[in-house]
From Swiss-Prot:
It comes from Oenococcus oeni (strain ATCC BAA-331 / PSU-1). It is an enzyme of class 6 (ligase). This is Cysteine--tRNA ligase. It catalyses: tRNA(Cys) + L-cysteine + ATP = L-cysteinyl-tRNA(Cys) + AMP + diphosphate. One of its GO terms (biological process) is cysteinyl-tRNA aminoacylation.
């Protein structure tokens, strides 16, 4: 029996989909004004892992996510670079796909841009005005928070204790346009010569919160099974989504709210605003094992924070290599025809332990413990010298399938060995860098490049890949 921790109730609850065997799932996507950082990737990986487990359990998962492609940050970046907002958004949407592909994140069933649903947004906002939940003020439209009966549920705060402008997206002067400081923008008046649309209230653009409500309703229906995102989105973003969606439809918006924890650097949340972030784009260019990055992100329970560092990444790689090595040892062992019932029973026991762990709000620590029991079994089976082909294949199948729930692939693939000349040049370059002979270091880097290999320097040392 699958149980999930529901942020709305702060309890683990038995998971019961609206339609048996089918799951509707919405997860908030990035604002595309820059490359995604490791913290953004953590959310994508966490919910990809949850999605993979639901698929493993036999559910049909309809997974929808968004790109916020109209926002002050995008407008500001476009003005800085002298290009259109669409050019900025398109550039970083392309980068998102390029950066998430090596991390083995399954593409969403539907992934849409906010600018693609503007007519739907205008219709949604108009309905809220008609029902008295929203009002127009000088070309903008705002939601009446105090009219929503359960506002603040996800924040677990009284209405009076909620922080005005908690999203950090409150425009200067916006407070003066509101009936109540807690009211939030559904549609923003836009007098500048930037991206905007005609509406019944004048030219403007949507507020941040409305797009996810519209996309979820449009592609998944009035009520969905799971809504996910980072814990920082619980208030105000998801709180506002819930309020406006339930006001619009008169129905419960989400059955289960799931939120992932932060990625921290030196015990402080990684964020672009703090400047303590590492982009996935940078990391992938300097680190040659994307599956180790994925393993680091998925080996910690999704609700717990991760303290990111190069040493933690290296620790994750070492752990993953234990699985890879055991898998390859057994794969390449000498088999005898037949099976071993005792081995098969041990495999079944660990598979059941994996399911039991993941059914407990996706307890990856206990699930990994089951996988490592299979790893130990694989090694001891090879050491026994009496490996039966059917039992060996079952161990291999289960290791690959279970670690595949974590999104880890390529267990059979060995890292490509480097030509001896490249290895020699790398050693010379490492010596030059230790001696701070930067000129020689650069010359050796260029020589390596001329031979078809690119060298990047990182806190993990020299990383080299074939061009």
């Amino acid at each position: 029996m699958l149980k999930v921790f529901n942020t709305a109730t702060l309890k683990k609850e038995e998971f019961k989909p609206i339609v048996p065997g089918k799951i509707t799932m919405y997860v908030c996507g990035p604002t595309v004004y820059n490359y995604i950082h490791v913290g953004n990737a953590r959310s994508s990986i966490a919910f990809d892992t949850i999605r993979r487990y639901l698929l493993y359990r036999g559910y049909d998962v309809n997974f929808v996510s968004n790109f916020t492609d109209v926002d002050d940050k995008i407008i500001n970046r476009a003005q800085e670079e002298g290009v259109s907002e669409n050019a900025i958004a398109s550039k970083y949407i392309k980068a998102f796909y390029e950066d998430t592909k090596p991390l083995n994140i399954i593409p969403a069933t539907t992934r849409t841009r906010a600018t693609e649903v503007i007519p739907d947004i205008i219709e949604f906002v108009s309905d809220l005005i008609d029902k008295g939940y929203a009002y127009e003020s000088q070309g903008g439209v705002y939601f009446r928070v105090r009219k929503a009966g359960n506002y603040g549920l996800l924040a677990h705060e009284n209405l009076e204790d909620l922080e005005v402008g908690a999203s950090g997206r409150l425009d200067d002067g916006a407070l003066a346009l509101k009936e109540d400081p807690l009211d939030f923008a559904l549609w923003k008046n836009e007098p500048r010569q930037v991206i905007k649309w005609d509406s019944p209230w004048g030219q403007g653009r949507p507020g941040w919160h409305i797009e996810c409500s519209v996309m979820s309703t449009k592609y998944l229906g009035y009520t969905i099974d799971i809504h996910g995102g980072g814990i920082d989105l619980a208030f105000p973003h998801h709180t506002d989504e819930m309020a406006q969606s339930e006001a619009h439809t008169g129905k419960q918006f989400v059955h289960y709210w799931l939120h992932n924890g932060f990625v921290n650097v030196n015990n402080e949340k990684m964020s672009k605003s703090l400047g303590n972030f590492t982009t996935v784009h940078e990391l992938l260019s300097s680190y040659d094992d994307p599956m180790a990055i994925r393993f680091l992100m998925t080996a910690t329970h999704y609700r717990r924070p991760i303290n990111y560092s190069s040493s933690e990444l290296e620790r994750a790689r070492v752990e993953l290599d234990r699985i890879r090595t055991a898998y390859r040892r057994l794969k390449n062992a000498d088999f005898k025809i037949g099976d071993d019932p005792q081995i098969d029973q041990l495999v079944s026991k660990q598979t059941a332990a994996f399911v039991e762990a993941m059914d407990d709000d996706f307890n990856v620590a206990n699930a990994l413990a089951a996988i490592f029991e299979l790893v130990r079994l694989a090694n001891s089976y090879v050491d026994s010298g009496d490996v039966k082909d059917k039992s060996a294949q079952e161990i291999l199948r289960q290791i690959a399938e279970l670690i595949g729930v974590f999104g880890i692939s390529g267990l059979e693939t060995k890292k490509e060995s480097l030509p001896k000349k490249i290895e020699l040049l790398l050693k010379k370059r490492e010596t030059a860098r230790i001696n701070k002979n930067w000129q020689q270091s650069d010359q050796l880097r260029d020589e390596i490049f001329s031979l078809g290999y690119k060298v990047s320097d990182s806190s993990n040392g020299q990383q080299v890949r074939k061009i």
